[in-house]
């Protein structure tokens, strides 16, 4: 029987950079995490993972089996560079091909959830056409994911198109597909003018995972825990009382820090203390 403890994971970019997943998962285990979320961002180096050989994919599966630390989710932010809403047909086609490869990769290595970035476009000007193309691209993507039995989950973003659970639910209702769900970031959700607790309650039944980070209005990255506006204890209480039992992922970008492991351990202790106050975990 699976343990009733809260699954707590760490973002790949919080840990030292490199391509050795056995080392990364061993470190995550030492730090007390249950899982690591993989990043496939817009850089060529991380995009290249989608073209890994069979042997490279098997090495990841083997590392998971050896350490017991899972890689159940992928943060797919590559669509900043190749957006599904692009008015350039070649760029949009590339975005759909990245989606196809990501779904195939997930199927091969056991990733269950691909977190999507809710940008119709990122470096270009958005308009009605980019949003229409984005919707159509999502529909095509969810069709692919359905066939592969891989869940696509929309992140709540640092971008007005997808800055609330209510807006993301609109896409969930439009797509009406069990393989499309929500992956809120309580930091991003709190940085906008949202009723955060009401939004979290509205998403219950569609939330498959939760990103945990601190933010300030207009500042969505690298805000030290406790220095931003997120009311972590209330968010954790709301999710617990609403019946959410899924994973939480600490999102950090400390891979280039002098001592990433120390930064992560400090953040882990801070977050777990707030979880304990919310009655989610036992106090240390």
Curated annotation (Swiss-Prot):
As its record notes, the protein acts as a catalyst of:
L-ribulose 5-phosphate = L-xylulose 5-phosphate
In the induction comment, the record states:
Induced by L-ascorbate. Repressed by UlaR.
Q: Which GO terms describe its molecular function?
A: intramolecular oxidoreductase activity, interconverting aldoses and ketoses; L-ribulose-5-phosphate 3-epimerase activity
| Keyword Metal-binding in record | no
Which parts of the chain span the membrane according to its record?
A: none
The UniProt function text for this chain reads:
Catalyzes the isomerization of L-xylulose-5-phosphate to L-ribulose-5-phosphate. Is involved in the anaerobic L-ascorbate utilization.
Q: What is its EC number?
A: 5.1.3.22
What does the organism's lineage look like at the top? Bacteria, Pseudomonadati, Pseudomonadota, Gammaproteobacteria, Enterobacterales
Give the GO terms filed under biological process for this record: L-ascorbic acid catabolic process
Please report a single Pfam family linked to this protein.
Answer: AP_endonuc_2
The name this protein goes by in its record: L-ribulose-5-phosphate 3-epimerase UlaE
State the UniProt keywords alphabetically.
Isomerase
Entry similarity comment: Belongs to the L-ribulose-5-phosphate 3-epimerase family.
| Group of enzyme by EC | isomerase
Under the heading NCBIfam families, the entry gives: hxl6Piso_put, PRK13209.1, PRK13210.1
Could you tell me which pathway this protein works in? Cofactor degradation; L-ascorbate degradation; D-xylulose 5-phosphate from L-ascorbate: step 3/4
């Amino acid at each position: 029987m699976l343990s009733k403890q809260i699954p707590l994971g760490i973002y790949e970019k919080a840990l030292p950079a490199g391509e050795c997943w056995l080392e990364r998962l061993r470190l995550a285990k030492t730090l007390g995490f249950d899982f690591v979320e993989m990043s496939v961002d817009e850089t060529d180096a991380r995009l290249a993972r989608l073209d890994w050989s069979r042997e490279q994919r098997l090495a990841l599966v083997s590392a998971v089996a050896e350490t017991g630390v899972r890689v159940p989710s992928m943060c797919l932010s590559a669509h900043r560079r190749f957006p599904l809403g692009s008015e350039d047909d070649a760029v949009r086609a590339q975005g759909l091909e990245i989606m196809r490869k990501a779904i195939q990769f997930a199927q091969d290595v056991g990733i269950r959830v691909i977190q999507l970035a809710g940008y119709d476009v990122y470096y270009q000007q958005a308009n009605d056409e980019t949003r229409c193309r984005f919707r159509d691209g999502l529909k095509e993507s969810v069709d692919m994911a359905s066939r592969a039995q891989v869940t696509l989950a929309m992140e709540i973003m640092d971008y007005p198109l997808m800055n609330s659970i209510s807006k993301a639910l609109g896409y969930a209702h439009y797509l009406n597909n069990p393989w499309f769900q929500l992956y809120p970031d309580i930091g991003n959700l709190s940085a906008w003018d949202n009723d955060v607790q009401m939004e979290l309650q509205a998403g219950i039944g569609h939330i498959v995972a939760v990103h945990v980070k601190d933010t300030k209005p207009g500042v969505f990255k690298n805000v030290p825990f406790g220095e931003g506006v997120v009311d972590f204890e209330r968010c954790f209480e709301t999710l617990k009382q609403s019946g959410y039992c899924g994973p939480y992922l600490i999102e950090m970008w400390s891979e280039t820090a002098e001592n990433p492991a120390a930064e992560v351990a400090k953040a882990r202790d801070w977050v777990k203390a707030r979880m304990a106050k919310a009655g989610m975990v036992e106090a240390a």
